[in-house]
Amino acid sequence: MTPRTRHGGRRPGAGRPGSGRRVGVPHRARPFHDKGHPEHVTWRFVPGIPSLRRRALAGAIGRAIRGITHSHARRRTSFRVIHFSIQPNHMHLIVEAGSKRTLARGLNGLGTWLARRVNERIGRSGKVLADRYHARPLTTPRAVRNAIVYVLQNHRHHEPSRHLVDENSSGPWFRGWAEPLAPPPTEAPVAEPVTWLARTGWKRHGPIAFGEAPSG
């Protein structure tokens, strides 16, 4: 009797070979997104790009965020960048979105804007973002406040700003500081928060002092 040839199923060595490329963030299905919970997003850039905190690059990134903010406001989508900061080789954002799909599409669109602006600025082409972003839902007022401190004051861990508030962030436009701060004359690059947690809830734990540093 001729043995039957087996097709499909799990077999040792079967499937597409691995790329051998080390990935910073594991590729896995993203969890459920609750529209009432802002997300803290960390996004790394590829090695070889100059410090993102240089004036020219930080300006290009700020314009990309302002552009995506205007684009989504014009189209009345539920994706919003509400806080951000630029570090030497990565950036932090706090975003809102009405659905898991809107979150993914909004961040992918932002990634395209960032790549275009950064490549134009430094005269290169190709990949700019190193890997998938890492997104963490913020589910309590305390978690949102901690994330705002972490994002806006993160420069203290990397390249401390010479200014009272980090100019390479949305901090100059932030209205939750404990001390008065006149905003810049230019339009804010970020959107106003809509979720209760990001708009009001976090304030239960008090305003943020200029000298407050992120924990951890």
Regions picked out by a protein language model, each given a short descriptive name:
Residues 1-39, 43-89, 96-216:
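Short Pro-Cys-Gly-centered "Cys-loop" motif that presents a nucleophilic cysteine in a tight turn
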